[in-house]
């Protein structure tokens, strides 16, 4: 019989015992940190009905998910942990206490091209806060402040949480008369770090059909940089021209104020107008976290505010805010930096306990010495 050559599919992770223990220890740090802030663990199915996952994912999501038929059922593997959470809260909302704070660490699946830092199967570690009817903006600052504490406990120092607000972007695009194209523009701008401004300009004028003037206005706007206060001051120059923009700017100023109050150093967070997030369900504050020594890896932690994600499953208003660590990507980066303990044993136990039968004792006596002989006292039942 011909033998099948064993192999691991591209983009899927399979670890030896020692690195698997390192990954488990990272997860333990995350669990303890999340629990410290009052988040409860949750698990949701890996497989969902396709209509659940695609309710508000946008065209990019449909291209990436693993989708299949089983009998008459149209099914898919989850591509993140946020959409299943929205379904869960809509389904079980009558049995939950709000605001509902949950964390989840689990595998997700995306059919993208496997490359360094990008996987088809990978762990995400999420925290989310869901409100009933309303959710105070202070939560939008608490979430990234917890990520600051989490990364610090993992031994990371040179990282930056970049913050923006999608209302600012939507309001600015409305000023340009581009309201109907705002979603497509944000998904295009979200590619800036990967493809650069020239290619983004080409997509804006080519695929989206924007004028050179409009594309230039967008690129100049998102290029506003400086200290957090300098960026906010520059944005104040646009206040009064669009209500959505004004609301987003007020929210962003509040989040920045709370982040400082929560003890997050300014070198670890920055207002960045290029941050848009590609998923359609974000409505307010958005985040991306990068490792300053590894910008080529991209974001290792991202998320934001979503007001309407549960509307496809219930009429109840369930606004939320959350953030997700790309744990698999972060694990490999820490390994490359030598920040994972290479001396971990390949077995979890320090001591092996064997049954001391008459047949076994002569075999192990030469290795263990006289002290290994069981005493009559220790063998008595108690």
Model regions: which residues?
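Positively charged, Gly/Ser-enriched RNA/tRNA-binding surfaces
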Residues: 19-37, 48-51, 72, 82-94, ...
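Glycine-rich, mobile lid/loop segments that gate access to catalytic sites or pores
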Residues: 161-173, 177
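Acidic, His- and aromatic-enriched active-site or binding-groove loops in soluble protein domains
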Residues: 61-72, 177-205, 291-293
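Polyanion/phosphate-binding surface patch
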Residues: 42, 46-75
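Short low-complexity, flexible loop/linker segments enriched in glycine and/or proline
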Residues: 56-60, 175-177, 285
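Auxiliary tRNA-acceptor-end handling modules of aminoacyl-tRNA synthetases
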Residues: 1-20, 69, 179-182
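A generic structural motif
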Residues: 162, 185-187, 377-382
């Amino acid at each position: 019989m011909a033998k099948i050559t064993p192999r691991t599919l591209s983009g899927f992770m399979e670890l030896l015992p020692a690195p698997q223990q390192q990954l488990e220890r990272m997860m333990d740090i995350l669990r303890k940190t999340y629990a410290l802030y009052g988040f409860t663990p949750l698990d949701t199915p890996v497989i969902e009905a396709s209509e659940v996952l695609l309710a508000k994912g946008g065209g990019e999501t449909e291209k990436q998910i693993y989708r299949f038929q089983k009998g008459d059922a149209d099914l898919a593997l989850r591509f993140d942990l946020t959409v299943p959470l929205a379904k869960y809260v809509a389904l079980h909302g009558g049995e939950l206490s709000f605001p509902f704070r949950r964390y989840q660490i689990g595998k997700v699946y995306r059919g993208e091209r496997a490359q360094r830092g990008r996987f088809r199967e990978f762990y995400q570690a999420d925290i989310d806060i869901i409100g009933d009817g309303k959710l105070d903006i202070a939560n939008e600052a608490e979430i990234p402040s917890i990520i600051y504490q989490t990364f610090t406990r993992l031994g990371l120092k040179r990282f930056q949480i970049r913050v923006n607000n999608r209302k600012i972007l939507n309001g600015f695009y409305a000023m340009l008369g581009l309201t109907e194209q705002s979603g497509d523009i944000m998904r295009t701008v979200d590619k800036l770090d990967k493809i650069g401004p020239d290619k983004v300009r080409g997509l804006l004028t080519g695929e989206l059909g924007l004028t050179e003037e409009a594309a230039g206005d967008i690129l100049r706007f998102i290029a506003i940089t400086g200290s957090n206060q300098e960026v906010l001051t520059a944005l104040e120059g646009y206040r009064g021209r669009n209500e959505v923009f004004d609301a987003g700017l007020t929210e962003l100023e509040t989040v920045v104020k709370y982040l400082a109050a929560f003890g997050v150093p300014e070198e670890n967070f920055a207002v960045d107008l290029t941050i848009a997030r590609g998923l359609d369900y974000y409505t307010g504050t958005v985040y991306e976290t990068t490792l300053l020594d590894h910008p080529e890896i991209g974001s290792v932690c991202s998320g934001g505010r979503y007001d309407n994600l549960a509307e496809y499953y219930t009429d109840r208003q369930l606004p939320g805010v959350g953030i997700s660590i790309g744990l698999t990507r972060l694990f490999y980066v820490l390994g490359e930096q030598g920040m994972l303990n290479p001396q971990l044993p390949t077995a979890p136990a320090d001591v092996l306990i064997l049954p001391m039968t008459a047949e076994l004792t002569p075999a192990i006596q030469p290795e263990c010495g006289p002290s290994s002989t069981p005493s009559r006292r220790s063998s008595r039942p108690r």
